[in-house]
Amino acid sequence: MARVLLIAPTCNGEDVGEAWVAFQWARRLAERHDVTLLTYHKRGARPAAEQLPAMRVIEWCEPPLLGRAERLNSLMKPAYLPFYLHARRWIRQALARGERFDLVHQPVPVAMRYPSPAAGFALPLLIGPVGGSLPSPEGFTTDDTSSPWFTRLRALDRHRLTWDPWLRASFRNADCVLGIADYVKEILAGVPLKDFQVMSETGLDALPERIDRSGRQGPVRLLFVGRLVRTKGVRDLIRALPLVSDLPVELDIVGEGPERAPCEALVASLGLEARVRMHGWQSKEKVGAFYRAADIFTFPSYREPGGNVALEAMGYSLPLIVVDRGGPGSATSDLCAMKLSVSTPEKLASDLAAAIATLAADAGLRDRMGRAAYDHVGKTALWSAKLDRVDTIYADLAGQR
């Protein structure tokens, strides 16, 4: 059992996104290690100390006003600077009064734009899993008209990794950096890293029962699940359907976001109302029903940092069609996914149509790929296996000093 100082500026099992991810890490690590958590208490939310009574929690209240404008706050995290100062001061004072930790682990923020408050102390430091900073492919750079203006600030990430001394020092001083996919190492190529390993930012508790779709009749059901933003490729998926008009395929789109209205307009303009159904946001239980009813999971996101939704789909024994860029390409194998290159919207739509046609026409191939998907996710994405790996990393880091 290691004495772990866990740094997570947001940690809430009743929230979504990174707050939920951090909570999963904290709860599970506390089952194996002696964890002290440094975090923020978001105004109006239940404190982490109440949600995680089995561990020591050091919690500061998020400054007023900084939590407003949810999407902007999610991207820029204006509260991170005061959290950084609080956490760094606490670490300095804790070490001065004789507290001892075997290592520090900072699993969030996932984005590679935030320096760690633990960098530079005489403690082994594990950062990650981190990811993001993927630019859009050149052929798509002028195609996004529905996203808010502030999402373009992501373009600054790579410049900061080149020029920001505090950010560079965090990764340079880390004893190990976990990246959510292989591309992260390429993005960090300009920073000398001591150790780099690939690990997804979250995992699955357990898998549902394997699903046998071999005897199904009726149209082949395609499924997309995710936030509706341009980079998810939903427009391109819709544009692919007229190219397979001779095949009995239908598409269910589960998710909400600024792309919903443009996608609904596109469906109407192409006369696809009978083949495409947009369901908006759905509860986790209902999303599970969509996975079970689907025959093929189609996720053509071309700037997807992680592969969590692909893990979910594989857990439901689904063959996948993904873009071979970022997280989904890394999370899947060639045995369970058709991986597409990406250059322009037109080429992506035609490649999607070709992949859909191949799978729609061959139930045996779908069945084999679905079985391979279930086997693959069982070997790579369960929390139990992930935490076993983390235990090994912790032991290695703690033994270095």
Give residue spans per PLM region.
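Donor nucleotide-sugar binding/catalytic pocket of nucleotide-sugar-dependent glycosyltransferases
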Residues: 56-59, 127, 156-211, 217
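Short hydrophobic beta-strand element within catalytic cores of glycosyltransferases
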Residues: 319-323
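Short alpha-helical donor nucleotide-sugar binding micro-motif in glycosyltransferases
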Residues: 171, 281-282, 289-294
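A short, well-ordered alpha-helix in the C-terminal region of glycosyltransferases
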Residues: 272-275, 358, 365-380, 389-392, ...
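Aromatic "clamp/platform" in nucleotide-sugar-dependent glycosyltransferases that forms part
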Residues: 302
